[in-house]
């Protein structure tokens, strides 16, 4: 078992007791909720006449179902409006902080908590959403949970969890131009597999991560779950502290200095013991594109769709399914694949730095004929900051639509959906069958910069060749 890692320290500090089942009852420092997985949890509390134990430790926003175009109330979708009203009622009744549409703080839950300074090193974080691992970028231990567990946290502020093993993933060296954090995590998942992290927490380390911004670290940690890991984290450092300083919920004054000293003490020890260690060279990572129906089916943009002979036997069945669904042939070059829709946004790549980098490539170009392209900021704050920098004008002049914040086309729970057999270039995190709203729609995952390259050429294109 691991010893001396940040994961072990944070786990031990939050252990209430070891249960007869062998699981640990873990105290949850920050609970994030949204409109999709919380209504049933609140209903279960009412059925049992239970109260929210620590409402000040729960924070809510609306993101999954919110339209990114017409946000007038009531929403056009009756189900979306009902979910919205339920969240408004539950947060008001239980005195829970709620970042509603128009508040200036609304957005995707995994974008707003960091930007408000709510997520901090050494915390345990839970949310009824798969990509809660995002918050591990701060040196927190963050878990995506189901609705019944949302109920448990509301009622007791604890979760019953089995302790994970810890795998250290080191990436060293400088990333090539045109290669981003999204490519790093897609490369890791490609190499370790979508089930490679089952039973593990991933500790991301090495010089590549040391040089990453907080928003880049969030992109990597966000997709830990796509590699099977329950959570992923980066040890806190000066980059973390510079990001957090002066944010609304960050410690202030003398408390700030004390917080840094404590956060530093949580870092994994130099002689920490890990259950597994894997290393990668940043120079080996290229702009990466998924070709199949899992995030692990990725290749460098200059590669071809792999043939069955190139795969392990246990990968061949899902590959055969992917060839058929994606309408791609083994050995076919991924470059040149026609694209219908381009989406920049999501909790993976909807932050300000993502939009800044994408805008660099969009400037001076125009979306290709027949391509629908749109940009969805991850939060109202991101949208405001981007507009202050003129990024919205760069995108609209290039033929992109500029939308309101929300989860948008990452998932099919709002009006932003693929139609029929369309194929999308998407900066989101999942390329499952039907994920973007059409039973036959197809998704290629890539970085925001690569999405721009696809948008302006109408096909999968190596962003490094874009003038």
Swiss-Prot record:
Note accompanying the cofactor annotation: Binds 1 [4Fe-4S] cluster per subunit.
Assigned keywords, A-Z: 4Fe-4S, Amino-acid biosynthesis, Branched-chain amino acid biosynthesis, Iron, Iron-sulfur, Leucine biosynthesis, Lyase, Metal-binding
Gene3D superfamilies linked: Aconitase, domain 3
EC annotation from Swiss-Prot or TrEMBL: 4.2.1.33
Source species, domain of life: Bacteria
InterPro entries, A to Z: 3-IsopropMal_deHydase_lsu, Acnase/IPM_dHydase_lsu_aba_1/3, Acoase/IPM_deHydtase_lsu_aba, Aconitase_4Fe-4S_BS, Aconitase_4Fe-4S_dom, IPM_dehydratase_rel_enz, IPMI_cat
GO BP terms: L-leucine biosynthetic process
Cofactor(s) demanded: [4Fe-4S] cluster
Pathway: Amino-acid biosynthesis; L-leucine biosynthesis; L-leucine from 3-methyl-2-oxobutanoate: step 2/4
Subunit structure: Heterodimer of LeuC and LeuD.
Role this protein plays: Catalyzes the isomerization between 2-isopropylmalate and 3-isopropylmalate, via the formation of 2-isopropylmaleate.
NCBIfam families (alphabetical): leuC (TIGR00170), PRK05478.1 (NF004016), PRK12466.1 (NF009116)
Protein name, entry field: 3-isopropylmalate dehydratase large subunit
């Amino acid at each position: 078992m691991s010893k001396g890692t940040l994961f072990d320290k944070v786990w031990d500090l939050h252990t209430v007791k070891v249960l007869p089942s062998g699981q640990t009852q873990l105290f949850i420092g920050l609970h994030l909720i949204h409109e999709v997985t919380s209504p049933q949890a609140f209903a279960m509390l009412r059925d049992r006449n239970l109260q929210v134990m620590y409402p000040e430790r729960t924070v809510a926003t609306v993101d999954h179902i919110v339209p990114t175009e017409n946000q007038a109330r009531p929403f056009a979708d009756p189900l979306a409006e009902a979910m919205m009203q339920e969240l408004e009622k539950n947060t008001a009744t239980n005195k829970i902080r709620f970042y509603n549409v128009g508040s200036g703080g609304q957005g995707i839950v995994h974008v707003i908590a960091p930007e408000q300074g709510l997520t901090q090193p050494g915390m345990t974080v839970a949310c009824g959403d798969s990509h809660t691992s995002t918050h591990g970028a701060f040196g927190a231990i963050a878990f995506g949970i189901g609705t019944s567990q949302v109920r448990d946290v509301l009622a007791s502020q604890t979760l019953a969890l089995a302790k994970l093993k810890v795998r250290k993933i080191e990436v060293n060296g400088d990333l090539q131009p045109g290669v981003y954090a999204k490519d790093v995590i897609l490369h890791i998942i490609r190499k370790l597999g979508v089930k490679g992290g089952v039973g593990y927490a991933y500790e991301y380390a090495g010089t590549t991560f040391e040089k990453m911004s907080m928003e880049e670290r969030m992109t990597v940690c966000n997709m830990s779950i796509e590699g099977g890991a329950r959570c992923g984290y980066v040890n806190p450092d000066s980059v973390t502290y510079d990001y957090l300083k002066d944010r609304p919920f960050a410690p202030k004054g003398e408390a700030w200095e004390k917080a840094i000293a404590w956060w530093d003490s949580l870092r994994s020890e130099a002689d920490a013991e890990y259950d597994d260690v894997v290393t990668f060279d940043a120079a080996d990572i290229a702009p990466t594109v998924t070709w199949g129906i899992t995030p692990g089916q990725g290749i460098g943009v200059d590669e071809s769709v792999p043939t069955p002979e190139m795969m392990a036997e246990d990968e061949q069945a899902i590959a055969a399914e992917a060839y058929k669904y994606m309408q791609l042939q083994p050995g076919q070059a991924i470059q040149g694949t026609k694209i219908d829709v381009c989406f920049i946004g999501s909790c993976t790549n909807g932050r300000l730095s993502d939009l800044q980098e994408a805008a660099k490539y969009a400037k001076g170009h125009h979306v290709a004929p027949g391509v629908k392209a749109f940009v969805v900021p991850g939060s109202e704050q991101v949208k405001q900051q981007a507009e202050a920098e003129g990024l919205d004008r760069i995108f609209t002049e290039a033929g992109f639509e500029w939308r309101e914040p929300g989860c948008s086309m990452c998932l099919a729970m709002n009006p932003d959906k693929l139609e029929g057999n369309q194929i999308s270039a998407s900066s989101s995190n999942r390329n499952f069958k039907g994920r973007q709203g059409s039973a036959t729609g197809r998704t290629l995952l890539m970085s925001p910069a690569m999405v721009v390259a696809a948008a302006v050429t109408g096909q999968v294109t190596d962003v490094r060749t874009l003038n």
